[in-house]
Regions:
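Structural preference for solvent-exposed beta-strand-turn elements
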Residues: 1-197
Length: 197
């Protein structure tokens, strides 16, 4: 695999997916970020088996392939590189060379085939809501989610949709936050708990 991209694009992508890298795990592959350049796009993926994040970054693919790199090491290297084009190249022995101007880093990777992929989600009956409104609703309710894992449902927010009303609810056992908004369209009743992480 050999790809080229700007530092700014790579840093942005790495910071997005890093939120799904677990701090403690018994599976070392989950401590990695998957760089997937097997198609015509460059995808970065992280997955802790509860939360998975995938993002696409701009760049050029010189040679297709995929590699999983330790998230902490990769993130530290990328952030310290000069603001220029970064070349990431991995060989058959999974050694990965990261170059930018005169800086060169050689790190060991893991096979991308061993990475746990995100499940494919069928997009049926999507809901339209403005980004601003969604951010505001989350900001106004996220503070009251539970921060311990004693009850998994309380570590997320309930999105309860009924007709043209969306109700977002979070609670931690001591306090509760409820926010109702009116949607532009009417939808079938649905309830889903979205992890607060």
């Amino acid at each position: 695999m050999k790809i080229r991209c700007l530092k700014s694009d790579l840093v942005k992508g790495v910071s997005i997916v890093s939120k799904a890298v677990p701090t403690k795990t018994t599976m070392p592959i989950l401590e990695c970020i998957l760089i997937d350049a097997t198609t015509d796009i460059i995808k970065l993926t992280a997955n802790d088996m509860e939360l998975g994040i995938e993002t696409v970054i701009r760049g050029q693919i010189d040679e297709k392939g995929m590699i999983a790199l330790d998230a902490r090491i990769f993130s530290d290297i990328v952030r310290k590189l000069p603001d220029n084009e970064i070349v990431i190249e991995s060989g058959v022995n999974l050694q990965t060379l990261i170059t930018c101007e005169k800086a060169k880093f050689n790190i060991s990777g893991k096979s991308g085939e061993d990475f746990s992929y995100l499940p494919y989600i069928e997009r049926e009956n999507p809901v339209s809501i403005s980004q601003f409104t969604l951010k505001e609703v989350i900001r106004q309710t996220i503070f009251s989610i539970a921060d311990n894992d004693s009850n998994k449902l309380m570590t997320g927010e309930l999105f309860d949709m009924n007709g043209d009303i969306l109700k977002v609810v979070s609670l931690d056992g001591h306090r509760i936050s409820i926010r109702k908004i009116e949607l532009k369209e009417s939808y079938e009743p649905k309830k889903i708990v979205v992890p607060g992480k």
